[in-house]
Amino acid sequence: MSLRKLTEGDLDEISSFLHNTISDFILKRVSAKEIVDIDITVLVEYTDELKVDISAELYLDELSDADPGIVDEAVDAAYRSLESFLDGFRE
């Protein structure tokens, strides 16, 4: 099943889904008190196919013992969950 023609609103919805998935993943595993900042950038483009680029940075308090590698796990989880989310956009 292929994706239907995606609108700008669809792309915004996909981008928000990915952003929220990453943020939720991190916040479930790291106390908000340990986080100085989270920078998540999601670029979603659609011409003939869907292109998704995600970058994320996690800035932790210097006293935090959380593994900064959690951000990579969060991005991987977002990519994995994207496929089932896209089912709502298929023809």
Curated annotation (Swiss-Prot):
Membrane-spanning segments: none
Domain of life of the source: Archaea
UniProt-listed Pfam families: DUF3194
Similarity field: Belongs to the UPF0440 family.
Protein name: Uncharacterized protein MTH_677
Organism from which the protein derives: Methanothermobacter thermautotrophicus (strain ATCC 29096 / DSM 1053 / JCM 10044 / NBRC 100330 / Delta H) (Methanobacterium thermoautotrophicum)
